[in-house]
């Protein structure tokens, strides 16, 4: 089995000082992306949504949305509140009991692409995010198919 390269913790768009968090417009834009992502998943990828904690049938739990929001803010180079509250993300460990194959990876990426579209994220930052999300989604696969 070929081991996938481990993604870097905080992505950088260039050698400049701006982080993806800054380029996206900060906290409110990132949290809007998270809401659009989970809304798209609930609407378009119900099998993937069902792998998450639910508040009601078909509704991904607020705690999951909030936790991913904190994680994404930090991962994009913003405040490290996730680390302060939850420790190191340890993505593979935290997702280890969730069956993630190619179908789940692709459903996750479709949900994120829909959210990025809905939030109007375009240009170089979009290309960068598409690439980085694909790398991380593939890294988290723990099933062959």
Regions inferred by a protein language model and the residue ranges of each:
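Core of compact, soluble alpha-helical bundle domains
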Residues: 3-145
């Amino acid at each position: 089995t070929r081991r996938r390269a481990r993604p870097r913790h905080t992505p950088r768009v260039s050698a400049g000082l701006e982080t993806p968090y800054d380029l996206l417009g900060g906290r409110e834009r990132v949290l809007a992306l998270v809401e659009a992502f989970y809304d798209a998943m609930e609407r378009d990828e119900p099998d993937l949504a069902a792998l998450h904690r639910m508040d009601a049938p078909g509704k991904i739990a607020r705690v999951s949305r909030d936790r991913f929001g904190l994680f994404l803010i930090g991962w994009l180079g913003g405040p490290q509140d996730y680390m302060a509250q939850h420790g190191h993300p340890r993505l593979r460990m935290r997702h280890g009991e969730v069956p993630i194959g190619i179908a789940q990876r692709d459903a996750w990426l479709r949900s994120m692409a829909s959210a990025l579209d809905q939030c109007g994220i375009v240009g170089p930052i979009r290309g960068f995010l598409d690439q980085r999300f694909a790398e991380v989604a593939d890294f988290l696969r723990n099933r062959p198919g």
